A protein has these predicted regions:
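Surface-exposed loop and adjacent secondary-structure segments within mature catalytic domains
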Residues: 51-79
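Active-site histidine-anchored catalytic micro-motif
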Residues: 1-39, 72, 77-181, 186
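Short secondary-structure junction motifs
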Residues: 45-47, 103, 243
Length: 257
């Protein structure tokens, strides 16, 4: 749900130019995330290419959070697919081609598990010299939301995350300590639903579904996790942070991710 909002936000921000999007298995399987990404692009009236990515983590079994996002990954909301055929090129190849066509300029935003990015960095070792930066939603300075130690995106594929953080590409991490502050409450998405356009209506439906689950665990709103790295690219002045070395635990069953 917040992935869909992040795409709509990126499309709406005049500071950003979208080159392409990719899908990866995460909270929902690739069989949902790939067509859903195409549906959102179609909804906003754009024609950005959407590339299929990894169906599972590099070394581990996938994790699915169906309760939060519904069986179809969009809270049960049905949207039409675009009439154009799906892109056949794998996400990791498309990423490399895009970076190679504009060396030092491409800013990559990652809002899911880092499997696609890690595969691309491994397959194309020079990719790390071609990317301008990676801005990602993942991790947390303190605590997690999947285990006491880990946030979902990193926990889902810690091996991929370790590859990305060790790559040397300048990386900005928007962790839970940041994203949990970016919260929409019921009055917010009800107001958006009243805007009278397709995107506002979708936001109201998506967060209505998420709220039916989240409200039962004591939270006061729905965190906009994936919008944070998108907003950071357009308005970095809204954020503060610090430099840190990051190591991803890939072995311990207690602190994985």
């Amino acid at each position: 749900t917040d992935d869909a909002v992040a795409i709509m936000l990126a499309h709406a921000l005049p500071q950003l130019q979208i080159i392409g999007l990719s899908a990866v298995a995460g909270n929902s399987p690739l069989s949902n995330t790939f067509p859903n990404t195409r549906r959102i692009v179609h909804l906003v009236g754009a024609s950005y290419p959407v590339y299929p990515g990894a169906e599972r983590p590099i070394l581990r079994a996938p994790h699915v959070a169906g309760a939060f996002h519904g069986e179809n990954g969009l809270g049960g909301v049905e949207l039409p697919l675009p009439p154009s055929p799906a892109e056949p090129m794998p996400a990791w190849d498309a990423l490399y081609q895009a970076a190679k066509s504009m060396p030092g300029e491409l800013r990559l935003v990652a809002t899911g598990p880092l499997t696609n990015v890690a595969i691309s960095l491994t397959k194309y070792p020079d990719l790390k010299t071609l990317l301008h930066s990676i801005t990602l939603m993942g991790g947390a300075a303190v605590g997690g939301n999947t285990t006491p130690a880990a946030e979902f995106n990193i926990y889902d594929d810690p091996d991929a995350a370790q590859i990305v953080f060790k790559s040397g590409v300048p990386t900005v991490m928007c962790g839970l300590d940041v994203t949990m502050q970016a919260e929409l409450r019921p009055a917010d998405w009800q107001e958006m639903a009243g805007f009278g356009n397709r995107c506002g209506k979708l936001v109201g439906e998506l967060f209505g579904c998420a709220w039916s689950v989240i409200s039962q665990i004591g939270l006061t709103g729905v965190a906009q996790h994936d919008s944070c790295p998108v907003l950071y690219l357009a308005h970095p002045e809204l954020f503060s942070g610090e430099k840190a070395g990051v190591y991803v635990e890939t072995r311990s069953q207690l602190t994985l991710g």
